[in-house]
UniProtKB/Swiss-Prot annotation:
Signal peptide: none annotated. One of its GO terms (biological process) is iron-sulfur cluster assembly. Gene3D superfamilies: HesB-like domain. Its cofactor is iron-sulfur cluster. It comes from Francisella philomiragia subsp. philomiragia (strain ATCC 25017 / CCUG 19701 / FSC 153 / O#319-036). This is Iron-sulfur cluster insertion protein ErpA. It comes from the Bacteria. Binds 1 iron-sulfur cluster per subunit.
Amino acid sequence: MSEVVQSVDPINFTESASLKVKELIEEEGDNSLSLRVYITGGGCSGFQYAFAFDNEIKEDDMVITKNGVRLLVDSMSFQYLVGADVDYKDDVEGAYFVIRNPNAKTTCGCGSSFSV
C-alpha cells in the first residue's frame, strides 16, 4: 500500500468530493469505509469509471487522504487516473461524482466512459 497525505497528490481528491464522501460515510455509520475509484472495461468508449465504498485497503492500493477520508485506487486503475480530478458536483443537472481525466483521449456524451 502506498499512502499520500495532503501533499501534491497524483490524483486530486477535491474538497467537495471528500466532504460529500465524509457525509455519506457518517450516514453509513462505519468509519472504516473508504471510497474506491476504479476503471472497468465497458461503456461506449472502452473504459468506464466506477465508485464503491470499501473497508479493505489492498496491498497495491494508492491511498489519498483528505479531510479524514480515504480515496483508494488500485494500481491498474491508477495508471489511467494520474493527474485526474475526483470531484463532486451539485448543480442544476443534479448531484453526482465526476472525474476530469486529462489522460482520456475521447469521452462519451454522458462522460462516464472514455478511451486512452
